[in-house]
């Protein structure tokens, strides 16, 4: 949820029926309000943050994530993650934007060194706060090098199009929320079920071994060779590499 329509009734329903919720907040007030404004241009931060804090506390700081998207406009995204922690959140995620290269906020290849340094900066502060008793969980640092998911999960990755679907407010079914609006990936509707089974079958075969450039990648069983949406946007087929 983006939090705009979140109220006590919705919180109560989610706490009763949903084991995990994702609360969309892009970080600091200026960052969030630039990317998540209302139609009149005003920002959403002041409205949604108190609701998210109440929601997280109602779950005893478990079974939720505050999740943001960083863009070229905030390559200092570690400050946004730490802002979550300063607001009292303990479960958080921050992911790079998926955008057409023509967009001014799209991440470019020359940004990668700065992004890698920022993850290092975040990791150092993450460890520091953990030692100080102010720790938090950052989803993308939760990587178990000795155990982790089963081999089938490592091969298949996120499971989009087969293990889960995105449902729009109009009931349309897509392999994942990032595909919503792309008609070539419309799988059906909640009333009709999955009608376009060819899409499901394509995603069913989308795994590490189906990706031609991924079979020699040393970390392929940790990233499952990347995101199908990114592959479709930038490399062609959903089983391409990105």
What are these regions (language model features)?
Residues 103-182:
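A C-terminal junction/extension of Radical SAM enzymes
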Residues 9, 47-50, 79, 114-117, ...:
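Generic recognition of stable, solvent-exposed alpha-helical segments in well-folded globular domains
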Residues 4-6, 28, 71-73, 99, ...:
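Short, solvent-exposed loop/turn segments at secondary-structure junctions
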Residues 1-97:
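Radical SAM/AdoMet-radical enzyme domain recognition
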Residues 32, 175-176, 226:
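Short helix/loop capping segments that flank catalytic or ligand/cofactor-binding pockets
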Residues 181-242:
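Flexible mid-to-C-terminal extensions adjoining Fe-S/redox cofactors in radical SAM and related proteins
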Residues 31-35, 102-103, 186:
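Short, charged, surface-exposed secondary-structure boundary motifs
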Residues 20-21, 62-65, 91-93, 136-137, ...:
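Beta-sheet entry/capping signal
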């Amino acid at each position: 949820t983006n939090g705009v329509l979140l109220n006590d009734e919705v919180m109560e329903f989610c706490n009763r029926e949903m084991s995990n919720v994702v609360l969309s907040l892009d970080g600091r007030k200026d960052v969030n309000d630039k990317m998540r404004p209302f139609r009149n241009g005003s920002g959403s931060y002041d409205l949604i943050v108190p609701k998210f804090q109440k929601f997280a506390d109602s779950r005893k700081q478990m079974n939720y994530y505050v999740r943001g998207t960083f863009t070229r406009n905030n390559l200092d995204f570690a400050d946004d993650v730490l802002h979550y922690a300063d607001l009292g959140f303990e479960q958080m995620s921050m992911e790079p934007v998926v955008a057409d290269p023509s967009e001014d906020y799209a991440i470019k290849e020359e940004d990668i060194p700065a992004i890698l340094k920022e993850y290092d900066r975040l990791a150092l502060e993450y460890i520091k706060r953990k030692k100080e008793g102010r720790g938090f969980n950052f989803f993308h640092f939760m990587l178990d090098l000795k155990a982790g998911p089963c081999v089938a999960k490592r091969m298949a990755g996120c499971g989009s199009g087969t293990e889960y679907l995105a449902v729009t407010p109009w009931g349309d079914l897509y392999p994942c929320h990032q595909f919503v609006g792309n008609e070539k990936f419309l799988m059906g509707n909640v009333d009709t079920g999955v009608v376009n089974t060819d899409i499901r079958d394509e995603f069913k075969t989308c795994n590490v071994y189906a990706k031609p450039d991924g079979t020699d990648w040393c970390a392929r069983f940790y990233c499952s060779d990347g995101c199908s949406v990114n592959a479709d946007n930038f490399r062609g087929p959903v089983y391409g590499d990105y």
